[in-house]
Amino acid sequence: MSSYENHQALDGLTLGKSTDYRDNYDVSLLQGVPRSLNRDPLGLTADNLPFHGADIWTLYELSWLNSQGLPQVAVGHVELDYTSVNLIESKSFKLYLNSFNQTRFDTWETVRQTLERDLRACAQGNVSVRLHRLDELEGQPVAHFHGTCIDDQDISIDNYQFTTDYLQHAVSGEKQVEETLVSHLLKSNCLITHQPDWGSIQIQYRGRKIDREKLLRYLVSFRHHNEFHEQCVERIFNDILRFCQPETLSVYARYTRRGGLDINPWRSNTDFVPATGRLARQ
């Protein structure tokens, strides 16, 4: 259980509550969650963040009416900057997008600008939005995370409670290595509903070699952990940086979609360009 799971800032969220679906534009449906909720317990404040990054959202169920009432469909790509005051709560995002369904917009650009304006206001930070026509995305292959997968290890695990203990003494030797490690076994749970969130994670670092068994045990320990996607990625970044002390570190997770949305947060303290192709489970 997260230390802030019952924080009053979460009381007003529609997440975990019965809600009515609206199909006419309603910006009031969007809800933000302060990033400080999980950053404060980690000792992170806006002026001392050890990383940069973004939350990348893919919007698969986006539709509206053109000026003549003809339905339009698109796939949206949203990038929410890590410096924003709030992250966007995903159920509220879904409800907000549903409110476009029977709303007329003159142009695609009007839709894009509306999304960008509303998301920036909710997040209190920088947000960029792109809309793709379906034929732009046809024929795109399923992507894969570059790196060495650490999942196929002959180990026994019987503890699924979150702990950083596995990262203690997880580095060895004085030689500096540079490697990219991948796991598809990341599973955490929604902070409010405790529904499972499934993801793949890519960890790229330069520093003393990290023990792969200990790293995998640490990642598996998220299995009963309740936090939002973005919060898990920041926790993983902070824990690896704290215990393993790499010179450079990038952490990037791509989660399976829910409600027509997938969330793909990344955090890095070096030059890092996230690949945005959807993975096999997305």
From Swiss-Prot:
Principal EC category: oxidoreductase
Catalysed reactions, as listed in the record: 7-aminomethyl-7-carbaguanine + 2 NADP(+) = 7-cyano-7-deazaguanine + 2 NADPH + 3 H(+)
GO terms, biological process: queuosine biosynthetic process; tRNA modification
GO terms, molecular function: preQ1 synthase activity
Pathway noted in the entry: tRNA modification; tRNA-queuosine biosynthesis
Keywords attached to this entry: Cytoplasm, NADP, Oxidoreductase, Queuosine biosynthesis
Residues binding substrate: 88-90, 229-230
Assembly information from the UniProt record: Homodimer.
Physiological role: Catalyzes the NADPH-dependent reduction of 7-cyano-7-deazaguanine (preQ0) to 7-aminomethyl-7-deazaguanine (preQ1).
Family: Belongs to the GTP cyclohydrolase I family. QueF type 2 subfamily.
Record-given protein name: NADPH-dependent 7-cyano-7-deazaguanine reductase
Source organism (scientific name): Salmonella typhimurium (strain LT2 / SGSC1412 / ATCC 700720)
